[in-house]
């Protein structure tokens, strides 16, 4: 039986003129945004890749340079058309998006058994540092242009029975949003733990451990003001909200009309600076919680953040995408230059749509 092609993630360029999609057919595709201002008139079947290349093995994790653009006018910066890709039994590698050539391989070898450690999560920050997460809750930090890690640590806490001590994701910020303090970054694990990574310190600090039936953290999203953290878990029908100053206690939850199953297509949530938090559904629609709600953690103005009562907040809006109820809308990401425009994946197909349209 032929395996269905599924989009694993979408990354916009910083200027909104192009975007990259990564698929489970080992392919990495780059798209140009058409010049037509009214995308409703576009034939979505004609949205074809500008460039594409394929690896000879599956892609476990990947991340794009935050300054990625096809039109880099600043020649003093390192080229921004870069993507880092992690796979099994292979080192983490840096590729050029334009020609698909491998530029650099990072040292991810386990010195004890001589095997390459699988990088399950990766992130490039604005200071060209590459963060990697692997098994046994290990985090390493690399300079993007050097193969050897400049910082490495792992948590000594053991996961509970049946849980995986794997760093599954790093914190995601809205494009164009406020930068975090230097060196401070959250990461999550499949054992439902949250850690703080800070290369100024010599250890990985566990800030949160949730005893829940959920199957592990898959996304950590930050509000534009940086005060609230939104945590997406597998086998869950809600997105947890935390105050960044107190990650031990759940503040509120965003209620989902479906459960994020362990073996389902990758349904990803996304926060942008204009429309708040959006997420696709298995029925092909897009759920949205507005910016005002997201920026205040779902706490009404007359309530205190110390109020112990947790509120389950339903979506404020649900948009139709004309995909049909049998086609999931898996990845939804807004264009940084035009927030009403978003790239949407449905199966292995990518289309451009406008909110509310």
From Swiss-Prot:
**UniProt keywords, alphabetically:** mRNA processing, mRNA splicing, Nucleus
Gene3D superfamilies assigned to the protein according to its UniProt record, in alphabetical order: YVTN repeat-like/Quinoprotein amine dehydrogenase (2.130.10.10)
Any coiled-coil regions, as ranges: none
Q: Where in the cell is it found?
A: Nucleus
- Classify the main location: nucleus
Entry keyword annotation includes Nucleus = yes
The GO cellular component terms are: nucleus
Q: Which GO terms describe its biological process?
A: mRNA processing; RNA splicing
Q: Which domain of life is it from?
A: Eukaryota
SUPFAM superfamilies, per database record = WD40 repeat-like (SSF50978)
Purpose: Involved in mRNA splicing. Helps to stabilize the U1 snRNP-5' splice site interaction.
* Subunit text: Associates with snRNPs.
Q: Report the family membership.
A: Belongs to the SWT21 family.
Descriptive protein name:
Protein SWT21
**Gene coding for it:** SWT21
């Amino acid at each position: 039986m032929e395996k269905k092609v599924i989009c694993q993630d979408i990354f916009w360029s910083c200027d909104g003129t192009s975007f990259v999609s990564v698929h489970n057919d080992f392919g990495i595709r780059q798209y140009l945004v058409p010049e037509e201002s009214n995308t409703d008139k576009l034939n979505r079947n004609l949205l074809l890749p500008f460039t594409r290349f394929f690896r000879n093995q599956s892609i476990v994790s990947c991340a794009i340079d935050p300054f990625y653009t096809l039109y880099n006018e600043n020649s003093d910066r390192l080229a921004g058309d870069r993507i880092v890709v992690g796979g099994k039994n292979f080192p983490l590698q840096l590729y050029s998006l334009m020609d698909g050539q491998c530029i650099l391989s990072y040292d991810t070898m386990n010195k004890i058994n001589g095997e390459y450690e699988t990088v399950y999560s990766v992130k490039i920050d604005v200071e060209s540092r590459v963060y990697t997460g692997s098994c046994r809750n290990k985090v390493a930090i690399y300079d993007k242009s050097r193969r050897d890690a400049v910082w490495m640590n792992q948590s000594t806490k053991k996961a509970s029975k049946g849980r995986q001590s794997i760093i599954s994701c790093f914190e995601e910020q809205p494009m164009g949003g406020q930068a975090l303090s230097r060196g401070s970054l959250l990461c999550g694990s499949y054992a439902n733990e949250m850690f703080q990574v800070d290369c100024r310190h010599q250890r990985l600090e566990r800030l949160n451990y949730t005893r829940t039936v959920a199957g592990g953290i898959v996304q950590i999203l930050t509000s534009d003001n940086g005060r609230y953290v939104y945590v997406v878990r597998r086998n869950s029908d809600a997105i947890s909200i935390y105050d960044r100053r107190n990650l031990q206690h759940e503040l509120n939850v965003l209620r989902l009309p479906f459960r994020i199953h362990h073996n389902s297509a990758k349904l990803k949530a996304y926060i942008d600076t204009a429309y708040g938090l959006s997420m696709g559904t298995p029925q092909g629609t897009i759920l949205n919680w507005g910016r005002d709600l997201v920026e205040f953690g779902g706490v009404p103005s007359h309530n205190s953040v110390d109020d112990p009562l947790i509120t389950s907040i339903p979506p404020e809006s649900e948009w139709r995408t004309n995909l049909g109820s049998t086609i999931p809308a898996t990845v939804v990401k807004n264009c940084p230059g035009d927030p009403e425009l978003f790239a949407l994946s449905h199966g292995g197909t990518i289309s451009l749509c406008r909110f509310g349209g």
